[in-house]
């Protein structure tokens, strides 16, 4: 039940519960001795421990800001392709440095909270590190999108660009759905998120088929065009990975 509620594996739950099992607070069958729990960690009433609530709010706000920042990073990266604009691509890459710093801030904050109160090892707050790491990974793939403009001056043809626009739309929706589902507990959005992932994979297949068709018409001696196909394929893959990471 714990694994299902938090969306993590049973093995991970077992690892998290081990310290409490060793202290005989949680029985082997995972029956919690609430009296002993309160003696060791304070009241089990979620409204009692205001420090816990404030810690949640602090890190949740950091994650919301990180999600908004990453969406802006993806947006600017794709805008650089739409406009074939090197300066926009460079600015998008600069945003990724901020994304990395935001991840470190979330990680250090969670570590500090857990070190002060070991009870947090059993709470949702430990999953915030993983969520922040996933936002950082999305930022990395956004960087791959921006680097296309820096590495290649060839504008994307209209047909392929139309597919990429769809993939960008699904990527932005996926980030939003995942954030609302995780932070706000809007689990009903999981269906919408899975729909986005399915549509993303469909568009990825369409894009790669289009690229393969264009490659077949290109001479092997055309090195510049060959490099273009490598770079644009990375863009397609990056959008797909953003969708997959959002589901994670």
Which residues fall in each region the model found?
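Cytosolic, long alpha-helical scaffolding segments
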Residues: 1-248
